[in-house]
Amino acid sequence: EMILHVCRNALGRTTVTAHDGSEIDFAGEWREVRYKDIVAERTECPDWFSLPKDEKVARAVALGIEIDPALEDFEITNQVFEKRIEPTLLRPTFVTHLPKELIPLAKLSPDDPSTIEVFELCINGQEIAPAYSEQNDPLAQREMFEAQAGEEIQKIDNDFLVALEHGMPPAGGMGIGIDRLVILLTGASNIRETILFPPVRPSDGR
């Protein structure tokens, strides 16, 4: 509603032009789709998430994506999402239930603990606003940190975990990419055109 409100008040209409020349109507339907579903749909591979790693790599390469063999399974999939799927999401789309490995600070989804309570709002082929529920269970958070750290256990933020043990109420947050939104609304050709206070040279030229 906020983006629709801004569009109406700034432009006097509810539509903007996408990068491919098509029209995006913020007053229209905003799609909601799970990460696993959109990956399976756009790769035309319903069993993508059960494929062995080498098969994922082969399919990603066939899509024109360079893949480092050292990447984890979830990283390979996310490369496919970011480089071949996200750019095609022109109309407003909430992508939900991302893999838990992508955001270790997010709360696990109660209906699928392999995913997290998160959404990414994609418009015009870009992520405009990521949001998620904060993990406030210290035991679950420690497990995520340990999985992320692997053998580098010293990287775990124990002070943060101790703070969680003292108690944290339910919380969540969202960050809107204002610069990307301004580009979308104004048709700016470069992100530098949206910076309110760009760096400038001193008057003496130094």
Regions found by a protein language model. Name each.
Residues 1-206:
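Class II aminoacyl-tRNA synthetase catalytic cores and aaRS-like
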